């Protein structure tokens, strides 16, 4: 047991030489694709999401981030539901703190995202489209596993919760109880991160 703890401690101390230094630039991001069937009789809902981000290390191991999120979701018509599509574009800022843990890095962070949604639904006899705006606070953590020098695979977890009220034309005349943004999302993602040091 003592040998195992000593080896783990030695790896943690040795890995501290791989800290990300002030001035490092970090482009990266994640891509995801999911297909979901709400029940066995419905057509699948297809969702594609891309989330690029750029970070700048304002001090050793502390990154300030700019985030972009684009998501598309769609479902084709079936006997039980109409055809619809939804797209979402989000812009945000955030930060992450990194800690060396051999052979890679663990991190934790926080971000603030402003999203703009638009949707279109086709049904017998017509078409409906609409949209809304919303704000979100996200907590995230993960592990960066090194692939080659300065390139890491990002295994992450994220929890996102809604802030404030929904905005947009569809919500101007809505009752107050329908305006509250009480959404919450938990996700697992994988991505690629690159680090360019000065």
Residue ranges and their predicted role:
Residues 176-185:
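Individual transmembrane alpha-helices with interfacial aromatic-anchor signatures
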Residues 1-23, 197-198:
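Cleavable N-terminal export/targeting peptides
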Residues 169-176:
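Solvent-exposed loop segments that connect transmembrane elements
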Residues 22-26, 31-33, 48-139, 145-151, ...:
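Gram-negative (and chloroplast) outer-membrane scaffold detector with strong preference
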Residues 38-43:
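Hydrophobic transmembrane alpha-helices
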């Amino acid at each position: 047991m003592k040998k195992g703890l000593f080896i783990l401690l030695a790896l943690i101390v040795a890995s501290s030489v791989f800290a990300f230094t002030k001035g490092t630039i970090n482009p990266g991001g994640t891509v995801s694709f999911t297909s979901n069937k709400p029940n066995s009789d419905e057509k699948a809902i297809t969702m594609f999401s891309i989330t690029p981000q750029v970070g700048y290390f304002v001090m050793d191991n502390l990154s300030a981030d700019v985030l972009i999120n684009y998501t598309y979701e769609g479902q084709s018509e079936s006997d039980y539901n109409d055809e619809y599509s939804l797209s979402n574009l989000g812009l945000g800022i955030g930060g992450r703190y990194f800690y060396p843990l051999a052979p890679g890095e663990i991190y934790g962070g926080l971000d603030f995202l402003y999203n703009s949604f638009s949707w279109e639904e086709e049904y017998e006899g017509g078409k409906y489209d609409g949209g809304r705006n919303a704000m979100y606070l996200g907590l995230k953590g993960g592990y960066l596993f090194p692939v080659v020098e300065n390139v890491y695979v990002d295994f992450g977890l994220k929890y996102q919760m809604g802030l404030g009220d929904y905005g947009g034309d569809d919500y101007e005349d809505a009752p107050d109880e329908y305006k509250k943004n009480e959404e919450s999302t938990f996700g697992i993602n994988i991505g690629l991160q690159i680090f360019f040091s000065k």
